């Protein structure tokens, strides 16, 4: 779709001259406003701060770069506005994007009074965001590094599909194993890759680190940096969560909403393990975004396979069933993961000889079977 060039007057009218009442997002790079147009409907209008672009050519390069970004998990650029106006050459350099009505991931995991995401919705959002970021890294040439990934920049679309937004800090990625050296570190505290901060070398793994932090937030619903622990080594979510994940005690750090609703613990453990691999100190030892996406998809498929209903019981026990009766069988029920008083349980159906009984076993206990 060809980009539309908007007039400044149109944008001012759609936002009541960029009124605070139309403000839907703000950051160090720009403010974002909601505007409604006769033909296009509701759009998101990103008005950068005056110092955002050093030149008109800088802005045009940004538009050309963003016009290449076409993916279902990336917020699409619809058009732009470039006018000199009355206040000099920086007066109107504005980007116009599609509008995503369901807010950002930050609204759901840190909370603005809305409903909590289910474990499956969290995984689905993580997979969608990984697809979008992976497309930036590998799906276009030259590649693009976002370098400001955080929950407020992951929007939630229809059916809880993730849409990565805010490409105000994007930079053309390096070629091959090279890195792009920047003159100034940009991003958000808590999500900034320490390797990038210390070396100024920007690579796709810079985004992978930020994504690892987001995965931890999806699990825990905690901020990346906890101001109440400012003088404590656990003020960062990575340090706070690491030991519990490494010991397999994911329940100690999970969002309590997940424990109350019930969740697939294996999936949560896997997400935590992937998150820790994303934030290892050496960038090249981190997985790529494509690998992250593939592992999340594989873990979700395994969780779905667990939930498949058992095969129907045989009408009669013939000679061919002798070995089956002797060895016994364990089936996962269609509702294999349940929650009782906030504790994840797994339901089994066990058949031994001609005796059949139901049991529920706590995953955290060594006791294999408890009779109903």
Regions found by a protein language model. Name each.
Residues 131-144:
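Protein kinase catalytic-loop region centered on the HRD/HxD motif
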Residues 1, 88, 93, 261-274, ...:
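Intrinsically disordered, low-complexity cytosolic regulatory tails
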Residues 199-204:
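Activation segment
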Residues 207:
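Conserved catalytic-loop aspartate of Hanks-type protein kinases
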Residues 1-96, 102-106, 110-123, 129, ...:
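Membrane-proximal cytoplasmic juxtamembrane segment of single-pass receptors
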């Amino acid at each position: 779709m060809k980009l539309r060039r908007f007039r400044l007057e149109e944008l001012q009218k759609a936002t009541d001259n960029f009124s605070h009442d139309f403000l839907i997002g703000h950051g160090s790079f720009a403010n974002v406003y909601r505007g409604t147009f006769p033909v296009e409907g509701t759009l998101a209008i990103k008005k950068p701060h005056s110092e955002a672009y050093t030149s008109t050519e800088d802005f045009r390069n940004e538009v050309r770069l963003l016009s290449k970004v076409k993916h279902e998990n990336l917020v699409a650029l619809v058009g732009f506005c470039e006018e000199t106006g009355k206040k000099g050459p920086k007066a109107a350099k504005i980007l116009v994007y599609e509008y995503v009505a369901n807010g950002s991931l930050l609204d759901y995991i840190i909370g603005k009074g809305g409903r909590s995401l289910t474990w499956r919705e969290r995984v689905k959002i993580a997979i969608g965001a990984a697809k979008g970021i992976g497309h930036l890294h590998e799906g276009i040439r030259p590649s693009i590094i976002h370098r400001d990934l955080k929950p407020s920049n992951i929007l939630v679309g229809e059916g809880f599909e993730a849409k990565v937004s805010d490409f105000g800090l994007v930079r053309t990625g390096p070629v091959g194993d090279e890195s792009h050296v920047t003159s100034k570190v940009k991003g958000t505290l808590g999500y900034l890759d320490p390797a990038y901060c210390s070396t100024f070398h920007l690579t796709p793994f810079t985004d992978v680190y930020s994504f690892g932090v987001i995965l931890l937030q999806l699990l825990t619903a905690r901020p990346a940096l906890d101001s109440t622990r400012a003088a404590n080594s656990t003020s960062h979510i990575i340090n706070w969560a690491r030991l519990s994940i490494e010991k397999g005690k994911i329940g100690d750090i999970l969002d309590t909403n997940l424990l109350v609703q019930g969740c697939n613990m294996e999936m949560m453990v896997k997400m935590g393990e992937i998150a820790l691999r994303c934030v290892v100190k050496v960038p090249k030892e981190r997985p790529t975004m494509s690998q992250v996406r593939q592992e999340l998809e594989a873990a979700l498929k395994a969780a779905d396979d667990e939930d498949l209903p058992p095969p129907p019981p045989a009408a009669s026990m013939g000679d061919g069933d002798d070995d089956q009766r002797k060895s016994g069988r364990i089936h996962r029920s269609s509702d294999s993961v349940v929650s009782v008083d906030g504790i994840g349980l797994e339901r089994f159906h066990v058949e031994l000889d001609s005796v059949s009984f139901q049991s529920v076993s706590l995953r955290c206990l060594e006791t294999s079977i408890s009779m109903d």
